[in-house]
Each structure stands twice: as C-alpha cells, then as structure tokens.
A protein has these predicted regions:
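Active-site cofactor/substrate anionic-group-binding motifs, chiefly glycine-
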Residues: 1-43, 47
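Well-ordered secondary-structure scaffolds
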Residues: 4, 106-108, 113, 123, ...
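Short acidic, glycine/serine/threonine-rich loops at helix termini
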Residues: 25, 43, 50-55, 86-88, ...
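Alpha-helix C-terminal capping segments
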Residues: 26-40, 120-125, 160-161, 215
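Short beta-strand segments
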Residues: 42, 76, 84-86, 117, ...
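Glycine-rich tight-turn/loop motif centered on a GG-T
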Residues: 56-66, 100-107, 140-144
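Phosphate/diphosphate-binding glycine-rich loops and adjacent basic-rich segments that engage nucleotide
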Residues: 77-126
C-alpha cells in the first residue's frame, strides 16, 4: 500500500542512516512543517549503538507512534506533519527482509539498504528526500568511498520512482549535540526550538532543512532557506508546531516546560577526563553500546528501554581536556551499572599531546 497526498502539497522527508546523539529529526520535522512543507515521517527504533526517533518521541508521556494508514494520513493533512512507526500494512516486507539481513550478514549491502530506505519513503508519499548519510566512528559507513556508492544508488533509484533525492555526507566521529539517550535528547530538541541550539546540531538541522526548502521551491537559495529556518525558531512557530504534533499524537504538551516529565533519574554520575590532551578520536559506537548497560538503548528489537537514562557528553574532536576535568555525566537508575558506563565512556576518548584540527560537520552534499 502507498499513501497519496494532494498534488499541490510539497511532501518531503529526511532519513538518517543512524548515529549517536542524532536528534535532528526532532527539530527538522516541526521546523519544516511550520514553513509549509508536508512531512509524513515514518521512523524507526534504536538498535545496537544507534538511537531511534520513535524511542525519543515515546519519552513524552502518552505520545503515540502506531497508527493505521488512514489515521496517519489524516494527522499529516491536519498538522502538516506526523511522526510514526511502520504499520503492518505499510512496507510489510521491509521488516521481514531486515530480520533476514541481520542473520545473513547483509545489513551493510548497498542494494538492500537502498531498498529499505526508499521503500518507506515511496510508500509514505514523499516526493522530496534528504538523506543524512553518516560517516565515521559512530556510523555503519566507515569511509567516503562506500558512502559515495550508496549515495549514487539512492539518487538513481529514487529518480526512477519520482523521488527527488539529495544526500548529505555528514560527520559521525563525535556524538551529535550534548545528549545521548531518549528523554535527554528530547529535552535538547525542545531547547533548540526555544532558540538555544548547539553548534553542530544547528549546522546540520539548518542545512538539511534548507535542502528540502530549495528542492520544493519554497526557497530559491540555501541562504534564503536558512534565514527562513532561523526566523521560524526565533518567532516560536517551530516550537508551537512541535507542541501541536505532541497534542495531536496523544502526548502531554507540559513536557515543553517541565523536563522532569522526560527524564528524571536517581543518579547523575560525573565523567572526568582520564588525562590531559587534545581529543583525537572518539569511539562513538562504543559510547552507544555502553549506554545499553543502563537501558538507554537495546540489543534486540524486543528489549525494553528506560527513556530517562543516557549521558551528556561535552567533548568533540579537537577539544583540549585537562586531567579530571568534568566532560559529562551519566544519568542512570542503577549506580553500579552507571559507574561501569562512566568507565566505558572514558575509554572511548583518545587524547593526543599534539593539537588536532576541528572537523567539519558536513563533508559534502550531492
């Protein structure tokens, strides 16, 4: 089954290949919808070291992500946006193929990745798509060559189905933003929409949203699009849109001002820098896996998660750290496991005595 929308609507979406601390959809969807785009976003859950948009949204009390095709379409038409999980009648084969890929060592097959991403987007009725293709220690694409091959396949396959695809190659060598973990990332997204963005998430959210505004002719240039995006945050339209989506999907809108509803844990354990030096490498994958010990993520699809747990992590590649300087904190409900996670996160940072260049957030857009 596929969903169709009236031809005059500018139906667009974004897909990320998955990373650590990647809460971009939570800002992009309300911003884009507040600027006149129609966003029928079908998202996934977290698995392994990567987080999932649905889990982040479900940290909002009452927020529903499962709808019939009819309900989903109605929500999108009424609010310009809905964020939901796959339903049984939409791309039913994808879940079966995914389970097979898992046990046949073909999770990284470019053809199967393309089929999985695009089948959802074609089925949900999108006509314009920006793909955030992550490269680095927290991505499943370790290098640019493999990423390029996948990008070409996504663009050419999309074209055959009337889907205009742009691909951004982005940096996943440092966790994105500050928060990693569901409720904590939701808080960070709300703060962004209140006009308090962090540098890396601002660059990424603005650029990806701008690509959609230009692709749909709502903006003539990326510069004009970015000005529109900044205005939507400044005048509160984007935050209002998020609140509208929360209410429409059964969530408690009080989370916008009461963060305790999103994340309250028994313990907040400090993470101190194990040595002095410049951050030369961050094993983002190891950080993602470490947080599974406190139930911030899951190893199997059936695992349940604790939406309140996670970590706040300050350092990025190139930053200088003093020994014992606070570099973040672990939010957990089990102190012993939390202390284990602190140690694992400390190990994920490699420090060098030589200065390290800051890395770009976006390598290229094709």
């Amino acid at each position: 089954k596929t969903i169709t929308f009236p031809a005059e609507l500018k139906v667009a979406d974004k897909h990320s290949t998955g990373g650590v601390g990647d809460k971009i959809s939570l800002m992009l969807a309300p911003i884009a919808a507040s600027l006149g785009l129609t966003i029928p976003m079908i998202s996934g859950r977290g698995l392994g070291h990567t987080g999932g948009t649905l889990d982040k949204l479900e940290s909002i009390p009452g927020f529903r992500t499962q709808f019939s095709i009819e309900e989903f379409r109605k929500l999108v038409l009424e609010h310009n946006c809905a964020l939901a999980g796959q339903s049984k009648d939409l791309v039913p084969a994808d879940q079966k193929i995914y389970a097979l890929r898992d046990v046949t060592a073909t999770v990284e097959s470019p053809g199967l990745i393309t089929a999985s991403i695009l089948s959802k987007k074609i089925a949900e009725g999108a006509k314009h798509l920006i793909i955030d293709l992550k490269i680095g220690s927290g991505a499943f694409m370790p290098d640019r060559e493999k990423a390029k091959e996948l990008a070409e396949l996504l663009i050419s396959t999309g074209e055959r189905f009337g889907l205009k695809v742009k691909v951004a190659f982005t940096n996943m060598n440092s966790p994105l933003g500050l928060a990693v973990g569901n409720g904590l990332e939701m808080i960070e997204a709300i703060e962004y929409l209140k006009g308090n963005p962090l540098k890396d998430t601002k660059i990424l959210t603005s650029e990806l949203t701008a690509q959609l505004l230009v692709s749909t002719n709502l903006a003539e240039t990326a510069e004009q699009a970015i000005a529109m995006i900044e205005e939507a945050v400044k005048n509160g339209k984007a935050l209002k849109k998020l609140e509208e989506i929360i209410v429409a999907q059964g969530g408690n809108p009080k989370v916008i001002d009461d963060y305790g509803l999103l994340s309250t844990t028994k313990y907040k354990l400090p993470i101190l820098s194990p040595a002095s030096g410049y951050v030369s490498h961050i094993d983002c994958r190891a950080i993602g896996y470490a947080l599974i010990h406190i139930n911030a993520g899951r190893m199997k699809v059936t695992d349940s998660i604790d939406h309140s747990t996670g970590a706040l992590l300050i350092p990025k590649i190139g930053d200088f750290l003093e020994k014992d300087e606070p570099i973040g904190e672990v939010h957990c409900n089990d102190q012993i496991k939390g202390e284990e996670v602190v140690k694992l996160i400390q190990k994920a940072y490699t420090l060098s005595s030589e200065p390290i260049a800051e890395e770009p957030i976006i390598f290229d857009i094709v």
